[in-house]
């Protein structure tokens, strides 16, 4: 993704960043203010960009499964892509921006429990936005 395309990216559309932008109840500074990526923050193993794209692919599969799920509550263990996305964003210090309650986030970190299907579907969109934002930060 070209760096100029990412300029001002805040996860909810391309918006020029002021020192702090308030959207809903969450505050978003510029990507540079929110996350400083260093070699220490980069996940080990395969390159972070490759890992990010793998997670996005898994997340797309999870979204398709969620849309087809007929239950109101689903087991978090079944959605590995969502778990990986949360873990990856947590390593980058972005877990606080996911929009989950502490209880729901804990379910994913333990990989056990159920969560409302509608909440999970809404959260996948937010995860995709944050992963794209992380991609823009790596492209710089």
Swiss-Prot record:
Highest taxon listed in the record's lineage: Bacteria
Key words of the record: Plasmid
Protein name: Uncharacterized protein y4kN
Provenance organism: Sinorhizobium fredii (strain NBRC 101917 / NGR234)
């Amino acid at each position: 993704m070209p760096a100029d395309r990412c300029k001002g990216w805040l996860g909810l559309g391309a918006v020029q960043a002021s020192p702090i932008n308030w959207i809903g109840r969450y505050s978003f500074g510029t990507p540079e203010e929110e996350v400083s990526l260093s070699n220490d923050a980069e996940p080990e193993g395969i390159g972070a960009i490759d890992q990010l794209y793998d997670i996005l692919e898994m997340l797309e599969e999870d979204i398709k499964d969620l849309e087809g799920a007929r239950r109101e509550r689903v087991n978090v263990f079944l959605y590995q892509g969502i778990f990986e996305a949360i873990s990856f964003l947590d390593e980058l210090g972005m877990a606080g921006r996911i929009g989950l309650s502490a209880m729901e986030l804990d379910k994913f970190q333990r990989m056990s429990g159920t969560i409302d299907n509608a909440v999970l579907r809404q959260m996948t969109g937010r995860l995709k936005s944050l992963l794209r934002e992380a991609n823009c930060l790596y492209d710089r």
